[in-house]
A protein has these predicted regions:
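Hydrophobic transmembrane helix bundles of membrane-integrated enzymes that assemble
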Residues: 1-132, 150-156, 174-259
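Extracytoplasmic catalytic/substrate-binding loops of multi-pass membrane glycan-assembly enzymes
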Residues: 135-148, 159-167, 176-185
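Serine/threonine-rich, low-complexity intrinsically disordered regions
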Residues: 170-172
């Protein structure tokens, strides 16, 4: 917990207004909304088809309150989208066995780590500020593409990982400029190296196959949405946020498991 004087963060909105992002007692204003996202995803897995209308309304209300105070857009949009998807699935009884949408969800569940990792990493490695659309996207993502490109250009990738000297917001001064990598995929590849990254990739592929085999569409959606969020947030290996990383260690010996 930090004093408010240490965390007075502002952001310019799309209409030019300056928005104060309340940290709500934490170091960063994005902390509590991201915790809420993973709690919500975990709640979806535990409650699955038992989720009620009251729960949807209550979670939507909490999501809006957090967005109003913190202006954390990614979490706000992801939670709203997931609630819409869950309601749509409930209305039309969709799971992995559904002909068209089921196949799409099956593909995303199995290959989402590979797809989102490639998209996130390549967008940063090949970032070109002279490209108008990439420059605009970088601005919308609060400079994440530029920071990722700088990290790759400075350190490159290694087999076993390396020490990367980051400079977060609390350490910025006249001598140290901000330097962060928010993409969970790129950060793991830079910090932990290619070998561990490949093991994690294989783990999520194996996990996705088991989820589809069990027809657990709710766990599959939770994994997909968490991996989308990891594209712009460094939560892949952070157990303070992401509980789903533990599923990679599941040995599949319990044949009666209803989850995987």
């Amino acid at each position: 917990m930090y004093e408010y004087s240490d965390v007075n963060f502002y952001r310019e909105s799309s209409n030019g207004e300056i928005v104060f992002r309340y940290p709500l007692g934490y170091v960063f204003s994005t902390y509590l909304p991201n915790v809420f996202l993973y709690v919500f995803l975990s709640w979806v897995v535990l409650r699955n088809h038992k989720l009620s209308v009251f729960e949807f309304i209550f979670l939507s209300f909490l999501n809006y309150v957090l967005y109003d105070f913190t202006d954390t857009r990614t979490v706000f949009y992801l939670v709203n989208l997931l609630i819409f998807v869950l309601i749509f699935m409930r209305m039309f009884n969709i799971d992995y066995k559904t002909k068209l949408l089921g196949r799409v969800l099956k593909f995303l569940t199995i290959y989402s780590f590979l797809f989102f990792a490639l998209l996130s990493i390549l967008m940063q490695v090949f970032y070109d500020p002279n490209s108008s659309w990439m420059f605009a996207l970088n601005k919308a993502l609060s400079g994440r593409l530029a920071y990722g490109y700088y990290a790759y250009d400075t350190y490159g990738f290694s087999i076993l990982g390396q020490h990367v000297e980051y400079v977060d917001l609390l350490d910025v001064n006249q001598y140290n400029k901000l330097f962060v990598v928010d993409s969970g995929y790129l950060k793991v590849l830079l910090d932990q190296g290619i070998i561990l990254f490949v093991f994690i990739l294989f783990g999520f592929f194996r996990l996705g196959k088991r989820i589809v085999l069990k027809n657990n569409i709710y766990l599959g959606l939770a994994i997909i949405f968490s991996l989308v969020n990891i594209m712009i947030n460094p939560h892949l290996l952070l157990i303070t946020f992401n509980p789903f990383i533990f599923l990679l260690a599941y040995d599949n010996k319990n044949e009666n498991s209803i989850y995987i």
